[in-house]
Structures are given as structure tokens and as C-alpha cells.
């Protein structure tokens, strides 16, 4: 896994007014603040000049919500495009999608466009307050496809509160519908490229200071069953790849993120055993995390799944 990416990064906006119910940064970084456009342009040019990076990222929780985003990218493109310096934006919000921005973002090369529906069914998107519809998703993908993009990446979260196999059915139907509509569009518009879709599934981790902080994490066996079910339902779809994050790491994250002082001895013991670079996959020692928890009488699975009552004291 990669914890740091090889590009110049400039923060353009802090906070987010969308308030998705699973998102911790959106709730703890308020109020919303935007950096002036002229400052962003100046900082980005200096950073690229001084570092030699050939890619830069304009970072925020929702970059296409930044009010001057098109103007900033147009100004930077004047200097950067001819030097083949490309722009990376975090996944674009589908309800804020516009083709002009998409073209500006990938004016150097049309590679992969990343979109984040987060949930595959309309019911579940409503639960998490991700206010986008299936029609919005279809419109964004097909517009990109028609205008030269051949690779789309989706971010989804599995194991969200109230998720069932019916929601997995809806996700499979959505992916199938996208591929079907793309085939129709290819024939209608004589498009000479295909459409490859990569779905990256992360496992829901309840975060403090969010409306879902009281919810327990779904049992990992059940989450794995949901993922297997989705893969089975979509195995016939050509050009679709489904990736998913390690479930054990998600469980540990769920334990630590809502943990209290009772975990101090656990963290100290792990540190003494050499577990301090475990954000990198090659250094993650799963057996040590589990053995240490057992030695201290800590049940990771139960802590991760714990459902807090509204009158229970939070750590």
C-alpha cells in the first residue's frame, strides 16, 4: 500500500459543506475555508518549479466544489501543459461533475477518471447522505466515455450501516447498466475505444464525531460474503475489475479510531514489537497484532462490532 504519493500537493480548500454521514474530515474540519485563487496558482507554480514533479494535485475534501476551480486550472495549464505536467484531482463528486472541468484536469493525457458513488443502491446513498442519483452516475460516465475516456474508477464502501445483499444486487445492476449503455453509445456514435471499469471497495469503518460513530462495523465474514456475492453477480461483465481492501486492516482501524485509554497498553506493546511502519503493506505484521491483542485480553472483533447506545459514554 502507498501512504504518500509522488506528486506536488497544494491544499485549496479546508472543510466541506456536504456532511456525508460516514466522513470524519467533513465533520471535524469545519468551518469551510477556501484559499484565494491567486495564492493557489503562485504556490503551485513555485512547488512544481522547486521540486521537479511532473504531476500536481489540488487537494480538498471536494475539489470540484471550489468556486474558482476552473479558472485556477486554466491558468496553471498555460504553464504546465506544454511541459507535460499533469493535474491530479481527488475523486470528483458526481453531483458536481462538469465536462469542462474533466477536460481541464486531463488536458495533458486522458487516463483514468475517478468517481465516488460510495454506495451502489439509491436507498443506501440516501442513508449515508450521498445525494446523487443513478441517472447522475450514468450521465457522468457516458459523457466521459463519449468524450475520450476509456477507463473509469469507482470508489464504493462495503459494510455500510443497514447494507444488505439487495444493495449488492443494485450495485451489480448499476455496473451492468453502465456497460450496456456504453455499448449502445459506441454503436450510435461510432466510438473507437472501449470502456474499462475498476471498482475499488473499501470496508466501512465507523468514525468518531460522525453520525455513524455509534454504529458497529459489520462482521468481517458478512462483509466478505457481500463482496463475494457482488463478484459473482458481475463476473459476466467484460472490462470490469473489482478490487477490495484487506478486511483485517479495516477491523484494526475500527478498533483504534473509536478506542479509549484502555488501548494504550496495546499500542505500546505493538510499538515495542516493531509495529510502527504498518501503514505500508510490506511492513504490516498481522500475526503480531492478533497475538498481542490476545496476550492483553483484547477482542478486536468485538470492539470493532460494538454498537454504542445513545446514552452510553463515548471515549
What are these regions (language model features)?
Residues 1-9:
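N-terminal [4Fe-4S]-dependent radical SAM core
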Residues 77, 105, 112-113, 217-229, ...:
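Acidic, Ser/Thr-rich peripheral helices and adjacent loops at domain boundaries
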Residues 32-36, 43-45, 53, 60-63, ...:
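Terminal amphipathic helices with adjacent charged low-complexity linkers/tails
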Residues 176, 180-190, 213-224, 229-232, ...:
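Long, polar/charge-rich, low-hydrophobicity segments
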Residues 46-198:
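Conserved SAM/AdoMet-binding glycine-rich loop
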Residues 23-39:
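Iron-sulfur (Fe-S) cluster-binding segments and ferredoxin-like electron-carrier domains
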Residues 11-27:
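Local cysteine-cluster metal-coordination motifs and their immediate loop/turn environment
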Residues 227, 236-315:
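Radical SAM enzyme core and accessory elements
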Amino acid at each position: 500500500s502507498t501512504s504518500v504519493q509522488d506528486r506536488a500537493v497544494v491544499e485549496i480548500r479546508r472543510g466541506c459543506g456536504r456532511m456525508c454521514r460516514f466522513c470524519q474530515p467533513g465533520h471535524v474540519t469545519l468551518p469551510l475555508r477556501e484559499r484565494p485563487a491567486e495564492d493557489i496558482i503562485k504556490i503551485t507554480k513555485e512547488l512544481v518549479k522547486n521540486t521537479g514533479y511532473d504531476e500536481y494535485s489540488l487537494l480538498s475534501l471536494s475539489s470540484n466544489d471550489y468556486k474558482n476551480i476552473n479558472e485556477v486550472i486554466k491558468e496553471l495549464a498555460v504553464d504546465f501543459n506544454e511541459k507535460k505536467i499533469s493535474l491530479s484531482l481527488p475523486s470528483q463528486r458526481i453531483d458536481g461533475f462538469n465536462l469542462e472541468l474533466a477536460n481541464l484536469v486531463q488536458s495533458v493525457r486522458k487516463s483514468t477518471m475517478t468517481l465516488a458513488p460510495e454506495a451502489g443502491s439509491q436507498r443506501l446513498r440516501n442513508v449515508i447522505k450521498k445525494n446523487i442519483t443513478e441517472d447522475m452516475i450514468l450521465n457522468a460516465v457516458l459523457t466521459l466515455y463519449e468524450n475520450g475516456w476509456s477507463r473509469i474508477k469507482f470508489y464504493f464502501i462495503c459494510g455500510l450501516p443497514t447494507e444488505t445483499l439487495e444493495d449488492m444486487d443494485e450495485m451489480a445492476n448499476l455496473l451492468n447498466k453502465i456497460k450496456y449503455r456504453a455499448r449502445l453509445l459506441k454503436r450510435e456514435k461510432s466510438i473507437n475505444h472501449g470502456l474499462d471499469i475498476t471498482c475499488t471497495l473499501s470496508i466501512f469503518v465507523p468514525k468518531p464525531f460522525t453520525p455513524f460513530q455509534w454504529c458497529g462495523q459489520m462482521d468481517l465474514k458478512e462483509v466478505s460474503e457481500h463482496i463475494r456475492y457482488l463478484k459473482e453477480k458481475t463476473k459476466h461483465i467484460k472490462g470490469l475489475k473489482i478490487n477490495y481492501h484487506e478486511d483485517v486492516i479495516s477491523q484494526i482501524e475500527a478498533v483504534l479510531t473509536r478506542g479509549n485509554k484502555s488501548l494504550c497498553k496495546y499500542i505500546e506493546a505493538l510499538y515495542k514489537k516493531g509495529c510502527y511502519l504498518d501503514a505500508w503493506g510490506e511492513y504490516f505484521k498481522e500475526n503480531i497484532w492478533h497475538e498481542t491483542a490476545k496476550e492483553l485480553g483484547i477482542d478486536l472483533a468485538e470492539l470493532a462490532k460494538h454498537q454504542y447506545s445513545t446514552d452510553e459514554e463515548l471515549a
